């Protein structure tokens, strides 16, 4: 099975057009106001006006309330919700039930990560994204030791955290994840994508 690819942190329409033309599976938009890659709900709608069918549009939320998520989802064409803050597993399940949309929950990996808990909820949500245990919520460029990931979970998870053109091939050979998610590793600057890095990243994923 091929590895799916999500590019995250878009702020500019030309970057989106390039990513779509290259064949990316999913586009991520950061709806967290404290992020340098933040875009408003209205801006997401504008940016996605010409995104074709079957490209998944993912909205990244950080510690938002259910009413806040509901309000934002009433505007742009977000098809998947990504919870990237300190949300509980039960909150993620509740959002999935209320919104009736796929929900991905991010887990910041550290030596205390409860892998039994991850395994328990992995099949109840639409995806679990593994990221570095950074002080910021995503897009830090920090990585983590893939050796922490139990072998029985590797083919089901979304791998993130410090991925780049230089290491994504090794990541796939080592982990064989369901999908990979990258933001800073394909950028010129925060929110500004590099067309050549996007091309090379996809090329190395798809081999």
What are the language-model segments listed below?
Residues 1-207:
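Conserved N-terminal beta1-alpha1 strand-loop-helix module at the mouth
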